[in-house]
Swiss-Prot record:
Belongs to the PAPS reductase family. CysD subfamily. The gene is cysD. One of its GO terms (biological process) is sulfate assimilation. This is Sulfate adenylyltransferase subunit 2. With CysN forms the ATP sulfurylase (ATPS) that catalyzes the adenylation of sulfate producing adenosine 5'-phosphosulfate (APS) and diphosphate, the first enzymatic step in sulfur assimilation pathway. APS synthesis involves the formation of a high-energy phosphoric-sulfuric acid anhydride bond driven by GTP hydrolysis by CysN coupled to ATP hydrolysis by CysD. It comes from Syntrophotalea carbinolica (strain DSM 2380 / NBRC 103641 / GraBd1) (Pelobacter carbinolicus). It catalyses: sulfate + ATP + H(+) = adenosine 5'-phosphosulfate + diphosphate. Heterodimer composed of CysD, the smaller subunit, and CysN. PANTHER family: SULFATE ADENYLYLTRANSFERASE SUBUNIT 2 (PTHR43196:SF1).
Amino acid sequence: MEKVMTHLEQLEAESIHIIREVAAEFENPVMLYSVGKDSAVMLHLARKAFYPARPPFSLLHVDTTWKFREMITFRDRMAAECGFDLLVHINEEGVRQGINPFVHGSAVHTDVFKTEALKQALDKYKFDAAFGGARRDEEKSRAKERIFSFRTSTHRWDPKNQRPELWNIYNAKVQQGESIRAFPLSNWTELDVWQYIYLENIPIVPLYFAKERPVVERDGMLILVDDDRLQLRPGERVEMKSVRFRTLGCYPLTGAVESTAATLPEIIQEMLLTRTSERQGRLIDHDQSGSMEKKKQEGYF
């Protein structure tokens, strides 16, 4: 009798197929590793896809210099434990100019340390494909992006010029300098990700679990006081609150949520009841009209 695959098994099989397809079709692929929960799942799937061999590509982390300290510690540990080559790229010109999210704002900071830094890294190592952990349920511009997302020689994305994807057939043809961003988790939801992490016992950054942390309420968000670069504004004060993060980015631009969910089952239960997007806590999604789509057109993840 034929075994009926569960919903998560179907998603896993589709993702592994996409990862293998990219590895087979492209000469020099790389996996973007942001250290978040989606990256953790994608890394786990890549290891499964080629087990017992090591995946035939490196990990690339674009370091904005403003990531949570726990993320950097976790990144280095996971890369070492999994045996991956970890490439870390920083936009040194941005560092020299002293660009930071407090003085220059989230839009400029994101453009310099994420978008431009990613384009620099892709050009430097001549990658023709890059895996990303974006999902269609996260945000409206990502909802209309293909699994194989074509990028021009300048890394730009044109939402009106996308290739058809029929069933599980993907067009991997690119000219010199062009590239593809591949999204194996496109059809997953946030709840799918958490259930898979629980079932597969996948390690994740402790910031996803609720505990008492020092936070400041700023612009309607709870910002973690992660280091001494966070300067308090007049009237602000640091409070200890039980919080966790649904999404991770640069700490001054990522809001925590008040929560008591300290275990995976508790997080899953919380997800079953929530009615808001996980990216509501990402300031970069709201710093201008059509923010995410504009960033993606310019070369963002």
